Amino acid sequence: MSLGEMLRRWWLVGAIAVALIALLVYVRSDRRRVHRALDRAENLMEKAGAEDQLSAFGNTRKLVALFAPGFLVRARPYEGAITDLQQLAAVIHRYRSGATALRISDRERKLELNRELGIATLTFVADVDSDYGGSPGRASYRIRIDWVRHDGAWLIHDFELVEVLAGRSWW
């Protein structure tokens, strides 16, 4: 084996190692974890058709578990301030159970992250396609979520519906 071939092989091994380390850093980064937490919340809020009560309560329970102790939810003009887990669960369940289908996509995500303090603010626009009793609709909302790192997980500390942008309400 020539010196040139050995150098190419070592260069390839080094490049693969650097790529794997970069991938690991990205996957484990707080930035990525916050975005995944939002993706999870959106997926749990969605539904494609009728749900049995056990599935509906299970999804509601999983959604409520994404909120930190001492959370605050503000969804004006649809709801007042919510700080109680049982009230939050009832509101989420009522909104989800009233819909035949909910599909959520988001855009314009902007994340501000302070790793040292373990806090983050994520603002975005949520586009919600819904079907309530055969009446399909689409609405868009500007949302701000303050996240807090709690026991290694990113949880919602403050959820605010900042602005209703367009469409009919799914609340």
Model-derived regions: residue spans:
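Surface-exposed, charged secondary-structure patches
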Residues: 87-135
